[in-house]
UniProtKB/Swiss-Prot annotation:
Record-stated family: Belongs to the class-I aminoacyl-tRNA synthetase family.
CDD domains according to UniProt: Anticodon_Ia_Arg, ArgRS_core
Record protein name field: Arginine--tRNA ligase
SMART domains per the UniProt record, alphabetical: Arg_tRNA_synt_N, DALR_1
Length: 572
């Protein structure tokens, strides 16, 4: 159930009874549970508009809520707030229903969409580094939530598998007579660095590299065979990283830049035909009045270079048109570094004008900040090099395993390694996903691996605590009526019933940290409930009801963490 929506509906009816129908209710959870479960903040705005005394109007609304099947009490506070306390019978009935529902009371959206989500998308011919982490895990979590809430999700890994860097690589390998050799990703990286130096310093080599790009685009069999070898090696590495991270990305989700190669010229020509793109110094350019350059003139969105070459803009236009036209997307999400915001704003504006992005479809830039080191600079190795993602994840598992062994010296090596991997990978992912994605954040091993505070280990431990209860509980009845009498029982129940609203917020806004904050709040409340309301020592209906609350808490934590892409453990 959507608890927020249910309470808001009751409040709206009370607003109508008080003569202010249609005014925004402005419903929020109370900051202090002693004041109730929710607070209505919309009366003051309605009173100002209606030229009434806000406290008197608030009292009318509160009186209209009296005897309500959902609201136990409505008390006016301050200049016109209304604090609401929910009926324990209402909470108990819905906890019982959620516990006995395969989806834990979370309904699917009434308006499902086909959503194409573009995330991870590394450039190939080099190893993935920490800069690829955020897009990969943020996109994966958003895609999971969208699926769980009833949408059709199409994942797209728009890898950089085309362009000048591949011409450089081919030119270098031919020059070094290594074009028939077998090689690995580490070799490719070494070759690429050497090729880049040659490209920057030797005009003749640069011309040769560009010639190989033309051959690649023209379908030259020898060049294509080398290119495919580069791509296969790179994608194999990327998939191994995705598997370690537990992402849902699969090889069939790869739709790289090369996929749209044949569509680039038709798109450029179409924009000219529609009068959007014009010739400017030999290039095809869309001038956008919505964006100004430093001189205050319309910004240039170049779709084809002088000489006929194409850019990211060309590929992204063709790609967007494909996703709307062929994949039938109603919503497009691009999970990309926030520094690319202007490019995507221009892409969406151009696509809208060209008719590629119809009015009934929505394109969203899901930007994110930078992972920083403790020195406040982008996260690097001590020598200043980019941190390879494989190395980061390996260190996470090693650190977590050492921590697990320290806390549980009796564990066998295999069990400690299994727990260490789950805790380590979960810690890295949660440290990122628990932050507002638009912000930069500091990468801190000690903080993320702590078993206290808003961390994955804390939430994973909360889940194991629930499992421990049921290993000792013996018989209990999930179908028996739920009875709530203690304040913390009611608080925990109300929190668990907010799950649907939180997931819908994440689906609507693409902010996974809302879910992380909710899970931390639920786990913290369960800890307080566990201490204040003995579960196994209680008797009769009280014992059974507390077990029901514990079970639903465990279910919610497990499902919620899974939607963040984080595994749980029965024992830690």
């Amino acid at each position: 159930m959507n608890l927020h929506q249910t309470v808001e509906h009751e409040a709206a009816a009370a607003f109508a009874a008080a003569g202010i129908a249609g005014s925004p209710v402005v419903l929020q959870p109370t900051k202090n549970a002693e004041h109730g479960d929710f607070q209505i903040n919309g009366v003051m705005g309605a009173a100002k508009k209606a030229k009434q005394n806000p406290r008197e109007l608030a009292q009318k609304v509160a009186d209209a809520l009296a005897g309500n099947a959902v609201i136990e009490s409505a008390e006016v506070a301050g200049p016109g707030f209304i604090n609401l306390r929910l009926r324990h019978e209402f909470l108990a009935q819905n906890i019982h229903a959620a516990l006995n529902d395969a989806r834990f009371g979370v309904a699917k959206t009434a308006q499902p969409q086909t959503v194409v989500i573009d995330y991870s998308s590394p450039n190939l011919a080099k190893e993935m580094h920490v800069g690829h982490l955020r897009s990969s895990i943020i996109g994966d979590s958003i895609s999971r939530v969208l699926e769980f809430t009833g949408n059709t999700v199409i994942r797209q890994n728009h890898v950089g598998d085309w362009g000048t860097q591949f011409g450089m690589l081919v030119a270098y390998l031919v020059e070094q007579q290594k074009d028939n050799a077998a090689f690995e990703l580490a070799d490719l990286e070494q070759f690429y660095r050497a090729a880049k130096v040659r490209f920057d310093e030797d005009p003749a080599f640069a011309d040769t590299a560009r010639e190989y790009v033309v051959k690649l685009q023209g379908g030259d069999e020898t060049v294509l065979a080398l290119w495919k070898q580069f791509v296969d090696i790179s994608l194999s590495h990327a998939q191994a990283v995705y598997d370690t991270l537990g992402l849902k990305l699969r090889p069939e989700d790869v739709a790289g830049e090369s996929k749209y190669n044949d569509d680039l010229q038709p798109v450029a020509d179409d924009l000219v035909q529609k009068g959007l793109a014009v010739e400017d110094d030999g290039a095809k350019v869309v001038f956008l009045d919505e964006f100004k350059n430093k001189e205050g003139e319309p910004a240039a969105f170049i779709v084809q270079k002088q000489g006929g070459g194409f850019l990211y803009a060309s590929t992204d236009l063709a790609c967007l048109r494909y996703r709307i036209g062929r994949l039938k997307a109603g919503r497009l999400l691009y999970v990309v570094d926030h520094r690319q915001a202007l490019h995507f704003e221009q892409l969406f504006t151009t696509s809208r004008k060209a008719g590629y992005l119809p009015e009934n479809a929505k394109a969203e830039f899901i930007g994110f900040g930078t992972m920083m080191g403790k020195d406040g600079k982008p996260f690097k190795t001590r020598s200043g090099d980019t941190v390879k993602l494989v190395d980061l994840l390996t260190e996470a598992v090693e650190r977590a395993t050492a921590l697990v062994k320290e806390k549980n010296p009796e564990l066998g090596a295999d069990e400690a390694a299994k727990i260490g991997k789950t805790v380590g990978i979960g810690a890295v992912k949660y440290a990122d996903l628990s932050k507002n994605r638009t912000s930069d954040y500091v990468f801190d091993w000690d903080a993320m691996l702590s078993f206290e505070g808003n961390t994955a280990p804390y939430l994973q431990y909360a889940y194991t605590r629930v499992q421990s209860v049921f290993r000792k509980a013996g018989e209990w009845d999930a179908t028996a009526p739920t009875v709530l009498t203690e304040p913390l029982e009611k608080q925990l129940a109300a929190e668990l019933l907010k799950f649907e609203n939180v997931l819908q917020s994440v689906a609507d806004t693409a902010y996974p940290h809302y879910l992380a904050a909710y899970l931390y709040q639920a786990a913290t409340l369960f800890s307080r409930f566990y201490e204040a309301c003995p579960i196994l020592k209680a008797e009769g209906a009280s014992r059974n009801s507390r077990l029901q609350l514990a079970k639903l808490t465990g279910n919610t934590l497990k499902q919620g963490l899974d939607l963040l892409g984080i595994d749980v453990l029965d024992v830690m």
